[in-house]
């Protein structure tokens, strides 16, 4: 059984958006292949939420800026003794390639927005019980198509997000690897520190304590309060050790 639980908390709006997009894209593939109504609604609800997130900000612009920033950071390691130069060069080329694909791709999510079935389901998702067969006969007949036909369509939908997924995965991997975990100790369930212009907090907490962190703050300063899962009987120790990375 896993004994450590990893919590991540964004320290700015762009990271909040990126983590939400990453989560929703991961959810798209959880229940594949789509074989029933429940699986279909899970998939289409996540597609709809993804499109909502895309409409709230300049996702492509922010990602392109971050790809450039990561390239500049890596270039400072070129020629440094003891650093794997081939690895640095390979990462820089991967970042450049991801940026080229992203900048030449159509508007993010446009292929999904223009799909008739997705549009029909999105219109009904906010209505309680609004995806019944009599409300959405199109979805009903789609669910009775051969499995291979549905699978092919779903793969095409997901593939339309590949330029975004590739760039986002690279950016988040580099950010997560940018800082090591360090042991910290909270006093009476509280801990605060300077963020040092970090984008993301990563926190490892022992499952044995059955505590979770409530995190507030921004890139320059943050605070963590540890709360018991059992609000009536749970207790927070006077001193609590945990691991923290400011990425």
From Swiss-Prot:
Keywords from the named record: Cell cycle, Cell division, Cytoplasm, Septation
InterPro entries reported for this sequence: ZapD, ZapD_C, ZapD_sf
Main location: cytoplasm
Gene Ontology CC, one term: cell division site
One Pfam family recorded for the sequence: ZapD
Subcellular location: Cytoplasm
Biological-process GO terms, alphabetical: division septum assembly; FtsZ-dependent cytokinesis
Highest taxon above the source species: Bacteria
The protein's assembly and partners: Interacts with FtsZ.
Summary of the function given for this chain in its UniProt record: Cell division factor that enhances FtsZ-ring assembly. Directly interacts with FtsZ and promotes bundling of FtsZ protofilaments, with a reduction in FtsZ GTPase activity.
Entry similarity comment: Belongs to the ZapD family.
Name of the protein: Cell division protein ZapD
